[in-house]
Design a protein with these regions (language model features):
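Rossmann-fold NAD(P)-binding glycine/threonine-rich loop
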Residues: 92-114
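Conserved N-terminal Rossmann-fold NAD(P)-binding element of oxidoreductases
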Residues: 3-8
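Rossmann-fold cofactor-recognition segment
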Residues: 43-54
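Hydrophobic/small residue at the entry helix of a nucleotide-binding pocket
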Residues: 10-12
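ADP-ribose/adenylate-binding Rossmann-like module
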Residues: 80-98
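NAD(P)-binding Rossmann-fold cofactor-contacting core
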Residues: 25-40
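Gly/Ala-rich phosphate-binding loop of Rossmann-like dinucleotide-binding domains
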Residues: 16, 20-21
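N-terminal Rossmann-like NAD(P) cofactor-binding module of classical short-chain dehydrogenase/reductase
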Residues: 63-68, 88-90
Length: 114
């Protein structure tokens, strides 16, 4: 199981650093590589430029996508997670679009957490 952590904004860094230091298998995805390297490059080299198509190629069944990206990315990432039978977590509220994915998530036996 790999955690695909998307976004390295200020609120993301403490939790992300803790997971990396604790030895979890994490791939850090960020829109700008330099910002991600500045945030966690001292403790991991597993940093990729965020691209939803590349994430799709790397995402496996049972993996976890953590989105610390802006809310407009949450539904596309949740849909990708459903397609790949992986779990999805965000720090956002439950939008009507996210709520609409609930039955599909139950059917796929994956968790969508907001």
């Amino acid at each position: 199981m790999t955690i695909h952590w998307c976004g390295t904004g200020l609120s993301a860094i403490p939790g992300l650093r803790r997971l990396i230091i604790d030895g979890h298998d994490i791939v850090v995805w960020n829109r700008t590589i330099e910002k991600a390297i500045s945030a966690v490059g001292d403790i991991t080299k597993s940093i990729k430029e965020f691209d939803i198509h590349e994430l799709k190629n790397c995402l496996g069944k049972g993996d976890i996508v953590v989105s610390m990206l802006p809310a407009d990315w949450h539904v596309p990432l949740a849909n990708l997670s459903l397609e790949k039978q992986s779990h999805f977590v965000s720090s956002s509220y439950i939008s009507p679009e996210m709520r609409a994915l609930h039955k599909e998530a139950v059917k796929a036996n994956v968790c969508l957490v907001n």
